[in-house]
Amino acid sequence: MTPTSRTPPERAAELRQLLNQAAHSYYVLDTPTMEDAVYDRLYRELLDLEVKDSSLLTPDSPTQRIGGAPAQGFASVPHRIPLLSLDNAFNVDELTGWYVRLVKLLGYQTNPKTPQPDLSMVGELKIDGNALALSYEHGVLIRAATRGDGANGEEITANVRTIASIPLRLQLVHPPAWLEVRGEAFIPNSTFADINTARGERGDVAFANPRNACAGTLRQLDPKVVASRQLDFFAYTLHLPDNWQAKADDPASPMNQWAVLQWLQAIGFKVNPNTALLTDLTAVEHFFKLWDEARHQLPYATDGVVVKLNDLQLQETAGFTQKAPRWAIALKYAAEEAPSKLLRLTCQVGRTGAVTPVAEFEAIPLAGTSVSRATLHNANRVSELDLHSGDTIVVRKAGEIIPEVIGVLRELRPAGAQTLKLPHICPECRSDLVREEGEAATRCVNNSCPAILRGTLRHWVSKGALDVDGLGSKLIEQLVNRGLVQSIADLYALEASLLASMDRMGNKSTENLITALQASKSKPWHKQLYGLGIHHVGEVNAKALAKKFPSAATLANAACKAPEQITSVFGVGNEIAQSLQQWFATPANQELLAKLKQLGISLEANEDELAHDTDQKQRTVSLQGQTFVLTGTLPTLSRSEAQALIEAAGGKVNSSVSKNTSYVVAGAEAGSKLNKAEKLRVTVLNEEELLKLLAS
């Protein structure tokens, strides 16, 4: 049968198959099978058929890779299966600690250096891009989303369709009802260079690194812009329905991670070829060393290797913490360091008035980004470094994320260089800065300081507090600089016409922001309390206080008249009680609370919250006789907060580990205490596990 004798639906189906096969050969296999001129002619034929009869248009058509009209925004969508981040290890000791904990959890007794077939691992490169969740139904791509917060992400399907290495239809004869693939979108180094060259020619600011360029590209509202930047994609994770088995015509269902990578490749995905099956930690160390030395020869950016337990059933047994799988870890490359010439010391002011010194230096490329500023934390750190004008400093990107000054090359110090001192005047409002005795932080105590106001507003609208989408830092800066907002309450009095006149604020953005502000009025009381930004009151303490005191009025009364009621709250000490007393006794804050109430923000728990709290109070917690040791930095709790929680539940916190220690609570950069705990086989908890123990 010739092409002209086929019906339009038959010919369209044939063209889709031919073009998709050709695209897969070109973009994924790197083995072109069709001349460009032939591809273009067939593509045009398919496009003509679809234009004449829109019923022939299908989601897997290659014509759908280049989207149509720009989107108005991105909807938040739930992930079928949480898309979690990985825990990080920055050295071999941390890697070994992870492995020992995993082996112990699975009930194996083995030396980390001894090959154990049941516990083989897969080593993969950690691509420095952006994670995507791809959802397929009956083999057809129906949705693509960003990681987001792990539970929900932004739907960017139209943009992802433009990535040629992502199949719109899977190469399966009998696909399952649903299938989820996770992987990394990225921009190759050569493409990134071309993008920045073009931006420079247009007078646009260059992207700092390929990862930032990729993230910005994926959130473009116009898919045609995304298509022009030629993103690529490596698949690495697969989720299938329980008990689903492939039919004889399709690749056999994978039983381990090594087979998952092969299966993904067989059904049409591009899989990173630089993987290895690893039998023990010695093999992992060799794999890591290999790519640490060779990574700069790759055509894309990588910031470490990922190690995964190979057996999928053992992965399921190991399970997850709240934030990451227990069966995988990212081993990051050592932080990169480079020297640069110090230009000046400046300061930035936070929402509490704390002034953070910042070193500004000649821009240097570091870990894939251009860096010209680094935090110095506080005045004590500035004194320790003994910085002088013209110094050559050494800058490191810790974890390849946060730039920090780690030292000074004093042998290169210019003759007669003057010691640099921190300013004594607030750079924002020109008020005198204050440093209280015993504190490392210098503060601006002017409540009208624009920097404090900006920080206060950013905190109020943050995700942990009122979560007001659409009110970002740039808009807040405009509102403060124009004198339109002088307190949190002023946000709720903003008129639509005024907002629409702001830079980059159209009618739709304004409408969405007004809606988000109205919705924030009904957020839970504990989020409102946290959002007020009272010094020392974090998310954990705000929840505890909100349970005890169901309104701002009852909390204020206790803080000012009965502070012992405050310190009776689980995990709340004198420092927080004093901070609450000072805050509620301040007339400006009393005026703020009154305004918020007038604007419809209840500042009290609703019936659902009260019912939940009543149920929670029925439970009792007792750690009587249990001893704890804290080590490392926990994700959300300070060490004093964790200690207060443990002691309030009857437990005791010691400073050293012994055979009588019940638990060691370990955070990031845990040191010798964690090693000793593992030698003595003391149970090690992370923050999430500690909180579960306290709540059980």
Curated annotation (Swiss-Prot):
Q: What is its EC number?
A: 6.5.1.2
Extract the Gene3D superfamilies matched here: 5' to 3' exonuclease, C-terminal subdomain, 6.20.10.30, BRCT domain, DNA ligase/mRNA capping enzyme, Helix hairpin bin, Nucleic acid-binding proteins
Swiss-Prot/TrEMBL catalytic activity: NAD(+) + (deoxyribonucleotide)n-3'-hydroxyl + 5'-phospho-(deoxyribonucleotide)m = (deoxyribonucleotide)n+m + AMP + beta-nicotinamide D-nucleotide
Per UniProt, where does NAD(+) bind?
36-40, 85-86, 124, 147, 184, 308, 332
Keyword NAD annotated: yes
MF terms from GO for this chain are:
DNA ligase (NAD+) activity; metal ion binding
Annotated signal sequence range: none
Superkingdom, natural source: Bacteria
Q: Any idea which positions bind Zn(2+)?
A: 426, 429, 444, 449
**Obligatory cofactor(s):** Mg(2+); Mn(2+)
Record's GO cellular component terms: cytosol
Q: Which UniProt keywords apply?
A: DNA damage, DNA repair, DNA replication, Ligase, Magnesium, Manganese, Metal-binding, NAD, Zinc
Per its UniProt record, what Pfam families does this chain match? BRCT, DNA_ligase_aden, DNA_ligase_OB, DNA_ligase_ZBD, HHH_2, HHH_5
Q: Which SUPFAM superfamilies match?
A: BRCT domain (SSF52113), DNA ligase/mRNA capping enzyme, catalytic domain (SSF56091), Nucleic acid-binding proteins (SSF50249), RuvA domain 2-like (SSF47781)
Q: Which residues are in the BRCT domain?
A: 618-696
Tell me, what does this protein do in biology? DNA ligase that catalyzes the formation of phosphodiester linkages between 5'-phosphoryl and 3'-hydroxyl groups in double-stranded DNA using NAD as a coenzyme and as the energy source for the reaction. It is essential for DNA replication and repair of damaged DNA.
| Name of this chain's protein | DNA ligase
Which organism is the protein's source? Prochlorococcus marinus (strain MIT 9303)
The gene that this protein is the product of is ligA
